[in-house]
Amino acid sequence: MHDIRAIRENPEAFDRDLERRGLAPLSAELIALDDVRKGAVSAAQAAQERRNALSKEIGAAKKAKDEARATELMAEVARLKEEAPGLEAAQGEAAKALDERLAAIPNRPKDDVPPGADEHGNVEYRRFDSSRERLTQGRQHFELGEATGLMDFEAAAKLSGSRFVVLKGQLARLERALGQFMLDLHTGEHGYTEVVPPVLVREEAMFGTAQLPKFRDDQFAAGENFWLIPTAEVPLTNLVRESILAEDELPLRFTALTPCFRAEAGAAGRDTRGMLRQHQFNKVELVSITAPEKSAEEHERMLACAEAVLQKLDLTYRVMTLCTGDMGFASQKTYDIEVWVPGQQTYREISSCSVCGEFQARRMNARYRAKEGRGVGFVHTLNGSGVAVGRALIAVMENYQNPDGSVTIPSALQPYMGGLTRIEGPKN
């Protein structure tokens, strides 16, 4: 959500930032809507002030025994009372029109975000190479999984349709191990507090993190006013909704392992085989709530925490700074971590870490009280995958595959697998 006062103070800067996003100028339209709102507020206030003044005049007229004047004034009060609901409605409608327009506009990119229309404009930030030799060929994860019978898309399709999977046996245990490993790392070494949140949330929570209203078609509704979460970012960030925190409480750092649900409305024809793009998947999420001056530093810290997962798994990856045309709706700046996937001979996104500034905080009314009497302001919010568990499973399977179809268990995961060192390939 944008601050209309900031737009009024510097409309040219606002329009320049929208242009970087590929959008037309909107400041004039927004200021016009705000003028209507201000006019409605002024009209309602003027009517109330007139009623207050009339009450005093009526008292004076009665005291002077001027009944004719008192009757005239009371008639005007009655008229103003009759008009009041309409003035209040006009005020509410004007405020709603402005808020709805502001809510539909994406966040303003930071100055250092590279320009670009789509993913081709993204810029490599850094990379990490595994200590193991990179595989230049190999089977894809679904070929490995189906050959062992431990990854069953056919059974999932009978249960739920396309873009679902059933994992069994040691592969199911490996996915569970990955999630537990990530949580232990983030809570034990990175200072995050583990949370087990609801996966059904109200519409207000989805609005707060900006999944709604713009991305309604990408979500799964569940009954009246409930939505399945597309990411734990939604409940974790909304933990500070409608609250005023003390600056000494910041930063807050939350992590959660949850199932996530996405309709993938715009993904027709993409990644139709395998686990890369599912309607339901598990993900470890990281969320930070900070004071404004600390959010840039926290963004780099969060990125390093997500990277640590892949480094400990000894997986090759690169970090990309997303360009203005590829970053998310609520983001000021985003880093994507892309892991090497030998079966496709390419890098695929496994984590996205974003700083949102006060964009989500304004939608949630999440504030903090600054020290030394500096007043109350909006917090900054950050979110990142720490990481997507299903995609981590893909990366482990494909990067640790052996010629016989078996998969070596990374040493970091072996304690979570009861000491198991490999998942056997198909029996001949």
From Swiss-Prot:
Pfam families documented for this protein: Seryl_tRNA_N, tRNA-synt_2b
Compartments where located: Cytoplasm
This protein's UniProt keywords: Aminoacyl-tRNA synthetase, ATP-binding, Cytoplasm, Ligase, Nucleotide-binding, Protein biosynthesis
Binding site for L-serine: 231-233, 285, 385
Catalyzed reactions: tRNA(Ser) + L-serine + ATP = L-seryl-tRNA(Ser) + AMP + diphosphate + H(+); tRNA(Sec) + L-serine + ATP = L-seryl-tRNA(Sec) + AMP + diphosphate + H(+)
UniProt-recorded Gene Ontology molecular function terms: ATP binding; serine-tRNA ligase activity
Pathway stated in the Swiss-Prot or TrEMBL entry: Aminoacyl-tRNA biosynthesis; selenocysteinyl-tRNA(Sec) biosynthesis; L-seryl-tRNA(Sec) from L-serine and tRNA(Sec): step 1/1
Class of the enzyme per the UniProt entry, highest EC level: ligase
SUPFAM superfamilies registered for this protein in UniProt: Class II aaRS and biotin synthetases (SSF55681), tRNA-binding arm (SSF46589)
Family per record: Belongs to the class-II aminoacyl-tRNA synthetase family. Type-1 seryl-tRNA synthetase subfamily.
Function: Catalyzes the attachment of serine to tRNA(Ser). Is also able to aminoacylate tRNA(Sec) with serine, to form the misacylated tRNA L-seryl-tRNA(Sec), which will be further converted into selenocysteinyl-tRNA(Sec).
Quaternary organization: Homodimer. The tRNA molecule binds across the dimer.
Protein name: Serine--tRNA ligase
Organism of origin: Methylorubrum extorquens (strain CM4 / NCIMB 13688) (Methylobacterium extorquens)
Gene of this entry: serS
